[in-house]
Amino acid sequence: LMAQMQYERFDRIPDTGPERVEYIARKLLALDYYITMEELRQILYVSRSTLNQDMRQVRRLLELYGLKVVHASHKGIRLQGTETALRRCMAELFFRDDGKWEKAPGTGHGEERISQIQQILKSRADALRVSYPEAVVRELALQIYIAAQRCRFRKEVEFDSSLQVSRR
């Protein structure tokens, strides 16, 4: 995918099936090029049949977001879907219920950056004398962070030109 979101190696190799499924899904979200099944197999230290079983689960998971794992002969696999779907999936797979940012391979300072964005949002809201629930500020900061990361690499959301903004 992108140089910075070219994920650093994860801290540890996943052991269980669900951990591998999440790892593979996150890996595919991070890449904007093909990766071979053999490369994944070597990264995860699993057999071909184990990887095939995990990939079935990965496909099911990503389909929930409107994303598809596509295969190209002699190239490997990669994700296909709209930029909006990719961003939504990233937000849900990298942001945990406990409020912690899961390190995406290559993001490095995600949690720190999101906290900085939150502080900016809070200070602007305070200046305008507006208050928002903490969860809303956190979600907005996360979406801004993802958008900034994706835009740096020319991954922009396309809008339908037929949509009109109503002015009241």
Positions of the model-derived regions?
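A cross-family "folded-core" feature that marks the main globular domain of proteins
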Residues: 1-168
